Amino acid sequence: MTFANNIVRDMAYTLQDIKVESGSKAVTQNVSLKRAVSCFELRATDIMPLTTKTQEITISGNCGTVFNPSTGFCKEKATITRNFSLVAKAHQERSIHSTLYTLLTDKDVTDIHITATAKDKEEKVIKTVNFDNVHLVIGKKTTYTGPIFTYPNNISFTVNQPEIPESGYDKKF
């Protein structure tokens, strides 16, 4: 299964036999759906510069956008790039967050690399942050929270509580 424009959205699925009978007899079947995606959320604790126009987030590693319903995993690895248009003036009193969904090649992966790049209207890079060995789990959300635009050279991480059942691998930098 391929997502439109290769943009993975929150989704659930099932793989089971369904009983089909002829005639007009009604058939009831209970279907239990499983969430097939992993969610990554990047939350800024600082205010973005007024010159910010776009944010590009790239995810790579054991993830992708093509779903194999017979295995419940990503069919093939692919680098995922999402671009977000921003109105910096609207975020001067509150921070921003970006949420991305991805399919994984296994239930629990630890080799995900994420790059977030803020650019101005002339496509010049304002700030880039990189995260290696991001831990994602199918059906869970991992949130990274910290100063995206003004982070210091040394970064520390702490856990943040997500709305979707937490993966246990959230970090604060």
Predicted features and spans:
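Tryptophan-paired
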Residues: T51-K140, Y169-F173
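Intrinsic-disorder/low-complexity, polar/charged segments enriched in Ser/Thr/Lys/Arg/Asp/Glu/Gln
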Residues: A26-T28, C39, H97-T99, K141
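Intrinsically disordered, low-complexity repeat and linker tracts
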Residues: F149-F173
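Structural motif
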Residues: R43-T51
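Broad, structure-driven detector of short, well-ordered beta-strand segments within folded domains
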Residues: T142-T150
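Beta-strand secondary-structure signal
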Residues: T28-N30, C39-R43, E56, H113-T115, ...
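Short, low-hydrophobicity acidic/polar segments
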Residues: M1-V37
